[in-house]
Amino acid sequence: MNIALPILLLAFVSLVQADDNIKKGKELFISKSCSLCHQTEESVPCPAGDALKSPKFMGDFWGKKREVHIGIGGPIKEVVLDEEYFLESIEKPFAKIVKGSLPGMAPLPTTEEERKAIMAYVKSLSE
């Protein structure tokens, strides 16, 4: 039996599922109002995000280091924008606040599945 066919089929199914998750994440990013403060396209301004100095999701950002305050006005720590940090930022937005940003994000009423879909979408934006 040729083992390559099942492996290719599994890879294809995984890609389709990943694309579906990104699409769902984009829909949630908009419907949960993330797009009001987090800019994702240079050509689409985000006045609320500019006023709050919210992190932008454009360019090469995923996996990069950033400085955050531990809590509101707390000590500075360097973190990496990875899955753990991103999910924590949605669940507990005041736990780590990007240096220079204003603490304004309210915790989002989301399920774990929704948070992971939003993360998949945001991660897909990084170049």
Spell out what each predicted region is:
Residues 84, 96, 103-127:
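C-terminal capping alpha-helices of c-type cytochrome domains
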Residues 25, 31-41, 47, 118-122:
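The canonical Cys-X-X-Cys-His
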